[in-house]
Swiss-Prot record:
Entries under Pfam families matching the protein: tRNA-synt_2c, tRNA_SAD
EC number: 6.1.1.7
UniProt note: domains: Consists of three domains; the N-terminal catalytic domain, the editing domain and the C-terminal C-Ala domain. The editing domain removes incorrectly charged amino acids, while the C-Ala domain, along with tRNA(Ala), serves as a bridge to cooperatively bring together the editing and aminoacylation centers thus stimulating deacylation of misacylated tRNAs.
Organism in which the protein naturally occurs: Pyrobaculum aerophilum (strain ATCC 51768 / DSM 7523 / JCM 9630 / CIP 104966 / NBRC 100827 / IM2)
Cellular component per GO, a single term: cytoplasm
Note on how the cofactor is bound: Binds 1 zinc ion per subunit.
Homology family: Belongs to the class-II aminoacyl-tRNA synthetase family.
The entry's keywords: Aminoacyl-tRNA synthetase, ATP-binding, Cytoplasm, Ligase, Metal-binding, Nucleotide-binding, Protein biosynthesis, RNA-binding, tRNA-binding, Zinc
One GO term of the biological process aspect: alanyl-tRNA aminoacylation
Main function: Catalyzes the attachment of alanine to tRNA(Ala) in a two-step reaction: alanine is first activated by ATP to form Ala-AMP and then transferred to the acceptor end of tRNA(Ala). Also edits incorrectly charged Ser-tRNA(Ala) and Gly-tRNA(Ala) via its editing domain.
Annotated binding of Zn(2+), by residue: 594, 598, 702, 706
Name used for this protein in its record: Alanine--tRNA ligase
Gene: alaS
EC supergroup of this enzyme: ligase
Amino acid sequence: MLSARVLKNTGFLRKQCPLCKSYFWTLRRDQEYCGDQPCVPYGFIGNPPTKISIDSLTELRERFLRFFERRGHARIKRYPVVARWRDDVYLVGASIYDFQPWVTSGAVPPPANPLVISQPSIRLTDVDKVGRSGRHLTGFEMMAHHAFNYPDKFIYWIDETAEYAYEFFTKELGIPPEEITFKESIWEGGGNAGECFEVLVRGLEVATLVFMHYEVKEGKYVELPLKIVDTGYGLERIYWLIRGTPTIYDAVFGPYLDKARRSLGFPEPPSELMGKASVYFGQMDPEVIGLEKAYDIIAEKIGVDPKWLREVFKPQEALYVLADHSRTVSWMIADGVIPSNSGAGYLARLLLRRILKNLKLVGVETPLVELFDMHLKELKADYPEVWEARNLILELVDIEERKYREILKSAPGVVKKAYEEARRRGRAGFDAEDLVSLYDSFGLPPEIVAETAKSLGVEVKIPDDFYSRLAARHAKREKQPEKTLVEMAKIADLPRTRELFYEDPYMKSFKAKVLRVIDGKYVVLDQTAFYAEGGGQPADIGILKHGGGAAKVVDVQRVGHVIVHVVEGEAPPEGSEVVGEIDWDRRYALMKMHTGTHVLIQSIRRVLGPHIWQAGAQKDIPASRIDVTHFKLPTAEEVAEIERLANSVVQANMPVHVKILPRNEAEAKYGFILYQGGVVPAREIRVVQIGPDEAPYDVQACGGTHLKSTGEIGLIKIQKVERIADGVVRFIFTTGLHALKYVQEIERQVAEAASLAGGNRDNLVDSVRRLLQRAEEAERKAQRYTELYAAEFVKNLKAEPVGKYRLAVVELEDEELAKKVAQIATGRDKELVLLVVGGGRVTVYTGGADVGPIVKALREVGFRGGGSRTFAQGVYSGDVKTLIDAVKRALA
């Protein structure tokens, strides 16, 4: 049983719902049901439970934050919606995500205790219901207060949490106490769990009060060292309750919906009808009865024709989807998400395509950027960071819409080919996995597949939760398997290795004691200056000298708290002293590459925009690479500016500072740009700052070895820029002497090219231009001569009758000449079949005959190839007479 002091002191009664069997607390002796959907209908639509007037989400949010500030809670800024501090999920799904796993595990203290926040959150688990149910959103603000109770420091727990909720809803919002129900439940999310109260008013859940004290490990609950108050008050839901509008969308997005309706020429929906439909929809489980079936049931309940109800609802549904999804996508892009085929970008693209699909189904042709821009103006006050990203958001939306339109053009061909493939496999149509494959491979929404399949006489059943399934598949990050050289059990008793490479990155040699040798090749020292592979920087190599012998160090890896050296040759004995010598030239070159990487990625960000985030990196010699999130290939001018900016930082000889800071302090000071290089799993963070404290050029959490100043880099040279995936651009670059060698090689090639062109470097462009002009003139003459020769060749072409066709066989090595001969000959003679052999190729041209039977006959004698209806080409290594006989058999 879950109870609280305020419930007992104010006379709440504990009851059990006869429908869902949940226990709940209420002041009403006559209350029979739990007060939650679907056990009871909404009772607030058109009938709000409070007289207090709150005119905006902004006002409601501020009331909540101030309420808890007055009660000793520190207000903290909202976190990004992209969870860059986590390695398990892409998006923040609740305010507690901000503090998982570091704070909830006890590894890091919270930024304040207790605290209050209003956190934008994104959940796509119910994306298919958005626009239809009247209450579901993909993006919402979770207003929350949190308290973290330690064994030696108690803040507050169940009694105070329930009391705060009771006071907020009754005193701050003016809701009568008898309208409030506290329903007992269990909450689980983000790897943690605990008992909870769901706070309900007139059938709507407006808050969840979770008392988290479990970690979920392999499906089992394990006690946490902390007891955490994890609350969630739905900003949008509470505002809907207060306004009593037909749907949550009308409350949250009212002004935008009005403008969008006028712009698109949509009629105002009958509010009474929408309200009734929302009430009934809330009581149904669409996952059980089906979304389309739900329309039929609702139509029957309110006494209207189902077809008419759909006609009224569909435009509104498209608008509601537009309003919700456009805000969510704008949040994501403003936080650096680029729509793509993977990661968080996949989820952003899914939402954009769902908008476009719904608008197309109701005949909207208005460019999506216009509808987005209209919404961005409404969001400007509450989310200034979204408005700052306006140009980027609109550009990406435009790109995505153009891609979508191209996808729709390809639909008939793609669907037909997929259907033919399904039939070859003995299947009559498309199943759910086929629809997923068509979406992921070609971007085709299932509704478009179904529409196209109708023309083939195929009926397609679309799962009601199709988009939710897609989102679930892509919601979590894939964990990379850890590289383990030795079993932890073999080194668990050893002390932590002292990391000399951090204490002095310029240390070239050192002395150490051998603590353990495993399998004759894995060596653990008490201290080491050999850098262990990590953060995209390769491990150091070198030598371990011992006694009269030496062993090559070929790899260095972290295994838990110790550093393991992989050696070749005679391993030093345990207990002996060794002298380690690092391959310094290689290490120093890698330090230049690593510091150069930080300089370059910040330069890319400053030129291309703040949406740039590192998507991967590898420091190596003679060249390194950085992969960044970007939606198009940078122009030559942009690349030149990036290179210029990076080298200006090198020339400025900025200091490079390394600081060890508590995680919270580092995040508060620098923000989540710290995690440009990825998640750092530590209580304290090693921060690498380029530039002075008052105006740093770049700041990142990093475990690599770095230079003392940027001047040591010498030179940064970008060698190549390419798109390696949708939404990802790769920069290949080099630094220092390797950069100089690269430039010198380019100079050598330029000089050689100039010499070959008959000039020098100063007039190379003019020389090449003259050569190209001559080459073009020669090409024109060659084409003319080919045409003349082909025409003469055709005059002498001999063909023999075979069936109703005429067969000519010629031997030609020149493929261009063969094409021209075939073009002239088959153009004049529609019954001609021309067989061309030569150059290792066999080609068949026809004036009109179907080449299919000919190809079939040729394959029987060893021909490998294919083509179109009147053309086929391939290879054949057998006797030419056998080839000719096969063609004759096909034509006879």
